[in-house]
Swiss-Prot record:
GO terms for cellular component: mitochondrial intermembrane space. The gene is cytC. It is found in: Mitochondrion intermembrane space. This is Cytochrome c. One of its GO terms (biological process) is mitochondrial electron transport, ubiquinol to cytochrome c. InterPro entries: Cyt_c-like_dom, Cyt_c-like_dom_sf, Cyt_c_1A/1B. It comes from Dictyostelium discoideum (Social amoeba).
Length: 113
């Protein structure tokens, strides 16, 4: 178990996800994409690999933006998505609190399996 997952609070992550992320993302197997992709199976696919979702050009490019999602990359991304991937379609400004990010990552690690 990573340090991020260990310090994350899944219940608070669920609340944060529902309040800040669920309007654009789903997490259940087979759920449709919304404004953002369904995050089921999130950890360790390349960032452009969710079927049926039209990714922004920076997400589709090879090299730097071909991200392997894990606890640390997601934790870093959620601080400021537009800084992490310039020109991403994701409108969310990010979670500035490290604890909030750890909580959401812990929730997603559990809910997207």
């Amino acid at each position: 178990m990573s340090d991020i997952i260990a310090r994350g609070n899944v219940e608070n992550g669920d609340k944060l996800f529902k309040a800040r992320c669920a309007q654009c993302h789903t997490t259940a197997n087979g759920a449709p994409n919304k404004q953002g992709p369904n995050l089921y199976g999130l950890f360790f696919p390349k960032s452009r690999s969710f079927p049926g979702y039209a990714y922004s050009d920076p997400n589709k490019n090879t090299g730097k933006f071909c991200i392997m999602w894990g606890e640390q990359t997601l934790f870093d991304y959620l601080e400021n998505p537009k800084k992490y991937i310039p020109k991403t379609k994701m409108a969310f400004a990010g979670f500035k609190s490290e604890q909030d990010r750890a909580d959401v990552v812990a929730y997603l690690e559990q809910s997207t399996k």
